[in-house]
């Protein structure tokens, strides 16, 4: 990721994403899934390393942590670790096929969901009931589906923007 891509593509998309998340959750009262995490995963699909990339991913983790029990720093570190793991796995697997990308996205979403629930149950001070677990299971299915749809949307948007930038060069 270079400065031009950051200011021309990623930063404006981040502002649109934050506006869309606020609009969907505040005005329409719809939980839009995890838009910020989906954006981070789709960025990691196209860019593998760089200091600016990891700073931006850490910042996205801080933004995500504001939504969930004030664990900003933990989520920032988790987002950077996902980036490091993705970069490390690119050495061993060829992520040229769309099926491998989908499997990594799905695995990342599920691992992030498990990470969120571990933090939730660690900070929870009430007894765990079967209705709570059933409610979390239903919300988890919705969460995975909607977040996966957002990943596909951001993948398509970033693919169109980044392929156009390389055609101009």
Go through each PLM region and give its residues:
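Terminal, non-globular segments
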Residues: 1-169
């Amino acid at each position: 990721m270079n400065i031009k891509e950051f200011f021309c593509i990623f930063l404006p998309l981040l502002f649109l994403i934050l506006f869309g998340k606020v609009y969907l959750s505040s005005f329409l009262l719809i939980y839009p899934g995890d838009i910020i995490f989906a954006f981070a995963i789709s960025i990691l699909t196209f860019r593998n390393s760089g200091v600016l990339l990891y700073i931006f991913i850490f910042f996205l983790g801080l933004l995500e942590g504001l939504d969930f029990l004030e664990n900003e720093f933990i989520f920032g570190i988790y987002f950077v670790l996902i980036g490091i793991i993705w970069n490390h796995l690119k050495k061993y697997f060829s992520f040229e096929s769309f099926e491998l990308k989908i499997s990594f996205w799905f695995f990342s979403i599920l691992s992030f969901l498990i990470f969120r629930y571990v933090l939730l149950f660690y900070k929870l001070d009430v007894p765990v009931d079967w209705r709570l677990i059933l409610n979390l299971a239903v919300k988890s299915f919705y969460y995975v589906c909607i977040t996966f749809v957002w990943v596909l949307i951001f993948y398509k948007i970033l693919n169109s923007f980044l392929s156009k930038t390389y055609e101009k060069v």
